[in-house]
Amino acid sequence: MEVIKVGGEVLDRVEDLARVIDDSILVHGGGPEVSDVMERMGLEPRFVRGLRVTDRETLQVVMMVLAGLVNKRLVAELRSEGINALGLSGVDGGLLIAEKRSEVVDGEEVDLGYVGDVKRVNAELLESLLDAGYVPVVAPLGAGEDGTVYNVNADTAAGAIAGAVRADRLVLLTDVPGVLEDLDDPETLIERVRPEDVEELEEKGIVTGGMVPKLEAAKMAVEAGCREAVITNLEGLLEGRGTIVR
């Protein structure tokens, strides 16, 4: 069984995605869609180390776009390709119990607002859906014990889920072939990364921006019991290429 994290851009390539779904749990992002709606509402998207700063207004947009627009469109497209997809968010059924995330940048704590870390995963819920023949499609929201809803980075959510269900593989799809030493040169792909190497790659500046939560999610999943994680794009997944974390 594998956990696949996809971005909103995959909505235009669902036919290709359907080819690789087999005993899978999908977790989707939707960052560009969220930013687009925010800008139309006069809100400025802000990011710290690849994580969206989420105040109350931004959280409302995130909930609306991820749990509504992106999730339901992806489920509908997958079902049209013969995939028995079932959409839910991390709030539903206590799937993702979250707590406020604290982020330290240059030695100082940065308040990200309603950004959450996954504290606990309801693995039994996902396993029951898989046993019933469904492909769970998860929008990355979580809720605290007090009912506070949090925006959970999709890579982080996928990593936590992969570890909790002890998946054979976590696939983190992105728009590049994997972790690159030079972002402008696909030939500089780093094919293998050990979990203990992740911090060093960040400190050297090889891994920046949105790749930071991807590598950290891969590390978290492998250390929690997932056999391996792969960071790649859809072409790489179809062709068996990418960065393997194991």
From Swiss-Prot:
It comes from the Archaea. Keywords: Amino-acid biosynthesis, Arginine biosynthesis, ATP-binding, Cytoplasm, Kinase, Nucleotide-binding, Transferase. It is found in: Cytoplasm. InterPro entries: AceGlu_kinase-like_sf, AcgluKinase_fam, ArgB, Asp/Glu/Uridylate_kinase, Glu/AcGlu_kinase. Its EC number is 2.7.2.8. Gene3D superfamilies: Acetylglutamate kinase-like. Pathway: Amino-acid biosynthesis; L-arginine biosynthesis; N(2)-acetyl-L-ornithine from L-glutamate: step 2/4. It catalyses: N-acetyl-L-glutamate + ATP = N-acetyl-L-glutamyl 5-phosphate + ADP. Substrate binds at G30, G31, R52, N151. PANTHER family: N-ACETYLGLUTAMATE SYNTHASE, N-ACETYLGLUTAMATE SYNTHASE, MITOCHONDRIAL. HAMAP family: ArgB. This is Acetylglutamate kinase. It comes from Methanopyrus kandleri (strain AV19 / DSM 6324 / JCM 9639 / NBRC 100938). The gene is argB.
